[in-house]
From Swiss-Prot:
The reaction(s) this protein catalyses: ATP + H2O = ADP + phosphate + H(+)
Species whose genome carries this gene: Milk vetch dwarf virus (isolate N) (MDV)
Binding positions (ATP): 180-188
Protein name: Master replication protein
Residue span of motif RCR-3: 79-82
C-alpha cells in the first residue's frame, strides 16, 4: 500500500498498554474488543493531520494492522465503537469533525456549492480523489463553462439575422462563411451566443485529430479563426465535419457519424481559392 492517506482503520492484537493521541494525529478513537475466536485486540480509527504512508503509521503504533479507510468517515468511526464485540471503551481523543461524505456524488454536490477545486478534496475525501480525480476536474470544467456561458450577452447586428434565417433552412451540404475584414463586427460574440443557445461546438482550429476527438456529435459546428490563423486553416476538417463523418484517431481510433451537421466559419478573411466548391459556400458579410 504505497499511497499516503489521511484516514486509517487499524487492529492491534494482544495490546499491552493504552493508546494516546500522537501530535501527528487529528483524531483517534478505539476500543478493546474480543473477536469470535477469542482474541483480544484494539479496534480503532485515526484521522491524521497530513497524508501519511503505511510505514509511517506502523511507526506510530508498532504491531498494528492498518488499512486505509474505504467507507465514509461516520462508518469508520461507528465500526471502531460497535457494541457487540466491545470489552472496554471506546476512548476518543482529539475532535471528530464530520465532513462531507467521501463519495463522488457528495463531492460533486459540494463543488457546486463551494466552488472548490478538486485538489482541495485530497485530504478530507481522499478515497474519492484517489479514484476520481480526472472526473472531478472534468466536472469542475463543466461548472466553469456553465458559469461563463450564463454571463455571455449579445449586442445584435443586422448580419446576425441573416445567419439566423439560414439556420432555419437546415442545409447540411453548405458552409456558412461569415466574413468581417475589419474586426469588431461581433463575430465571436455571436459564436458565443450560438454556443449558449444551441449547444454549438466551438473551435479556433487545429489538428484534425484534436478537433475530431473534441467534437461530440453537435449538429452546429463553429470555427472562429483569429486573423493570424489565415495561413493555417485546416480546410480538410471543415469539409469532413460538413459531411457528417470524421475519423478520430486520438487515444482510440473511432469514426464519428452524424446525419446532419451545419458548419459556420467566422473569419477576417475569405477561404483560399479552390478549397471548397462554389456551390457549397454561402457568404454572410458582417
Amino acid at each position: 500500500m504505497a499511497r499516503q492517506v489521511i484516514c486509517w482503520c487499524f487492529t492491534l492484537n494482544n495490546p499491552l498498554s493504552p493508546l494516546s493521541l500522537h501530535e501527528l494525529m487529528k483524531y483517534l478513537v478505539y476500543q478493546r474488543e474480543q473477536g469470535e475466536a477469542g482474541n483480544i485486540h484494539f479496534q480503532g480509527y485515526i484521522e491524521m493531520k497530513k497524508r501519511t504512508s503505511l510505514a509511517g503509521m506502523k511507526k506510530l503504533i508498532p504491531g498494528a494492522h492498518f488499512e486505509k479507510r474505504r467507507g465514509t468517515q461516520g462508518e469508520a468511526r461507528a465500526y471502531a465503537m460497535k457494541e457487540d464485540t466491545r470489552l472496554e471503551g471506546p476512548w476518543e481523543y482529539g475532535e471528530f469533525i464530520p465532513t462531507i461524505e467521501d463519495k463522488l456524488r457528495e463531492v460533486m454536490n459540494d463543488m457546486k456549492i463551494t466552488g472548490k477545486r478538486p485538489i482541495e478534496y485530497i485530504e478530507e475525501c481522499c478515497n474519492t480523489y484517489d479514484k476520481s480525480a480526472s472526473t472531478l476536474r472534468e466536472f469542475r470544467g463543466e461548472l466553469k463553462k456553465k458559469k461563463a456561458i450564463i454571463s455571455w450577452e449579445l449586442q445584435r447586428k443586422p448580419w446576425m439575422d441573416e445567419v439566423d434565417t439560414l439556420l432555419q433552412e437546415r442545409d447540411g451540404r453548405r458552409i456558412i462563411w461569415v466574413y468581417g475584414p475589419q474586426g469588431g463586427e461581433g463575430k465571436t460574440s455571436y459564436a458565443k451566443h450560438l454556443v449558449k443557445t444551441r449547444d454549438a461546438f466551438y473551435s479556433t482550429g487545429g489538428k484534425t485529430a484534436d478537433i475530431a476527438f473534441a467534437w461530440d456529435h453537435q449538429e452546429l459546428v463553429l470555427f472562429d479563426f483569429p486573423r493570424s490563423f489565415e495561413e493555417y486553416v485546416n480546410y480538410g476538417v471543415i469539409e469532413q465535419l460538413k459531411n457528417g463523418i470524421i475519423q478520430s484517431g486520438k487515444y482510440q481510433s473511432v469514426i464519428k457519424y452524424s446525419d446532419y451537421v451545419e458548419v459556420i466559419v467566422f473569419a477576417n478573411f475569405t477561404p483560399r481559392s479552390g478549397m471548397f466548391s462554389d456551390d457549397r459556400i454561402v457568404y454572410v458579410y458582417a
